[in-house]
Regions:
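C-terminal regulatory/interaction module of P-loop NTP-utilizing enzymes
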Residues: 1-172
Length: 172
């Protein structure tokens, strides 16, 4: 699993690659005869580059978590990268996936994801658990909790989820 955690301000430098500037500077300072400071050994591979590289075990799974937290320009870049399953590192060229990754996008619906991106995905809504499932989750996470308190707590959470709230509560 390769995970790309999305956040506001995410860009290609933090999602595809960065150059190890310190190592490049040391190589130049040492004069070790390194002609190319943009060699792959100075490349820090981020999630999207890792996802398009060959993997001996077959196509990797790329989790792009909370895509709704990014901005429109990054979403447009991502749309292009996922349509061709390739990324470009200007100093090294185009790196194209031999086996396209299996991509999973998650969203908390803090904003609408662009239609062009949604058209390229299978959409599956995961609703909040019912009372019994919430109880299973709570007792699995807190087996030492008292049953009476757990019942009251889960009932309270279930009631809150019926209210008109911007963000509904979970149990995490």
């Amino acid at each position: 699993l390769i995970r790309l955690q999305c956040y506001e301000g995410l860009d290609t430098a933090t999602s595809v690659y960065e150059w190890n500037f310190a190592a490049q500077m040391l190589a130049m300072r040492d004069g070790a005869g390194e002609a190319d400071i943009y060699a792959e050994k100075y490349l820090i591979k981020r999630a999207l580059l890792q996802a398009v590289e060959p993997h001996a075990s077959g196509p990797p799974v790329l989790l792009i978590d909370e895509i709704d937290r990014t901005d429109a320009p990054f979403e447009a870049f991502l749309l292009e990268a996922l349509s061709d399953f390739q990324v470009t590192v200007p100093e090294l060229g185009v790196i194209k996936a031999q086996d396209p990754p299996i991509v999973i996008l998650t969203s908390n619906r803090t904003r609408e994801v662009h239609d062009a991106l949604k058209r390229r995905c299978f959409y599956h809504w995961v609703d909040f658990p019912d009372f019994d499932r919430d109880m299973e989750i709570l007792t699995a996470r807190l087996p030492e909790s008292k049953l009476a308190l757990s019942l009251v707590f889960v009932a309270f959470i279930q009631q809150l989820r019926k209210e008109d709230m911007f963000k509904l509560p979970g149990l995490v």
